[in-house]
Regions:
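Short alpha-helix capping/helix-loop boundary micro-motifs
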Residues: 112-115, 180-185
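Ser/Thr/Pro/Gly-rich low-complexity linker/stalk segments immediately outside membranes or between
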Residues: 32-50
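Surface-exposed, glycine-biased beta-strand/turn segments
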Residues: 44-143, 147-150, 190-193, 243-245, ...
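Zn2+-dependent peptidoglycan hydrolase active-site motif and core
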Residues: 123-183, 209
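Surface-exposed intrinsically disordered loops and tails
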Residues: 167-183, 226-275
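Hydrophobic alpha-helical membrane-insertion segments, chiefly the h-region
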Residues: 19-30
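Short hydrophobic beta/alpha edge segments that flank linear recognition/processing sites
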Residues: 141-146, 187-217
Length: 277
């Protein structure tokens, strides 16, 4: 019986050792996989994305069209906020009438800040395809249209002071007048998300700190443009009005919530919008 007991004990010990070994091996594999996953998830976007060599979107008679297959892009890309919106005191809703004219773009107001307190940065990689300078209340203002190869364009306006690289471009344009129309850039200029586009905004004489921001999706027409009445009202501005979006939900969640909590920046149109519901 003693021999049998000793044999049983040895067998049990061997089984326990084997089980521990198997558990240890499985744990090692699991931890290794977790490390690989963590390393993959934490890879900076700049290391996996390379700037496109050229713009694949061109404007023709029927609007913006891609000249080759666009990259795979989410239906609703998340963009960086173009400014520190913790300073914003109001939001201008896209798709409303302001100052007697229809505005497919929105924007931000910064009533508690000076003009030079607001820095505007690129919310998305893209190519500057158009730009313009014009006079508002006697002060020079700048506008840029920037197109991403996904087919998303954004417009930033009422920029007051530009960084040197963009000022060199603006210096080649005709002298500014009250006409705010833009002109094409040739060649186009690539900018990365986060690049500085302006170091002051709005009208400095009256310390009116604000800027315009519109986002346009050329992969499809917006819901508002499906209305016959809307089509008739905006037949002359299909490029912008038929493709403008409510960019509130195109921001990181915290910024999106902040924007939606802001009071409307236009006292007349308020929160009325053809795009934001």
């Amino acid at each position: 019986m003693n021999r049998l007991q000793r044999g049983s004990h040895v067998l049990i010990i061997l089984i326990v050792v084997a089980v521990i070994g198997i558990i240890g091996a499985l744990a090692w594999v699991f931890v290794s996989n977790m490390k690989d996953s963590d390393q993959s998830d934490s890879t900076p976007l700049s290391q996996v994305d390379t700037p496109p060599s050229e713009l694949i979107w061109q404007q023709g008679e029927v609007g913006w069209q891609s000249t080759s297959t666009p990259p795979e892009c989410p239906a609703q890309p998340i963009m960086k906020s173009p400014a520190d919106i913790s300073k914003a005191t109001g939001v201008l809703y896209p798709g409303q009438t302001r100052g007697g004219n229809y505005k497919p773009h929105g924007g931000f107001r910064f009533d508690n800040n000076k003009n030079a307190d607001i820095t505007v940065t690129a919310p998305l990689d893209g190519f500057i395809v158009r730009g313009g300078s014009y006079l508002a209340e006697g002060e020079v203002q700048y506008t840029f249209d920037i197109m991403n190869n996904c087919g998303i364009m954004y417009r930033l306006g009422h920029l007051r002071v530009l960084p040197d690289n963009l000022q060199k471009i603006a210096d080649t344009w005709p002298a500014p007048t009250a006409d705010s129309r833009t002109q094409s850039l040739n060649p186009v200029v690539y900018v990365k998300a986060g690049d500085t586009l302006a170091t002051s905004v709005g009208i400095t004489e009256t310390v009116n700190a604000f800027f315009d921001w519109g986002v346009y999706d050329y992969r499809q027409e917006n819901e508002a443009s499906k209305s016959i009445a809307y089509q008739q009202l905006h037949a002359q501005d299909k490029e912008l009005s038929w493709h403008a979006v409510c960019w509130f939900d195109w921001l990181p969640s915290a910024d999106s919530s902040k924007v939606k909590s802001l009071p409307p920046g236009d006292p007349t149109s308020g929160k009325n919008s053809d795009y934001c519901r």
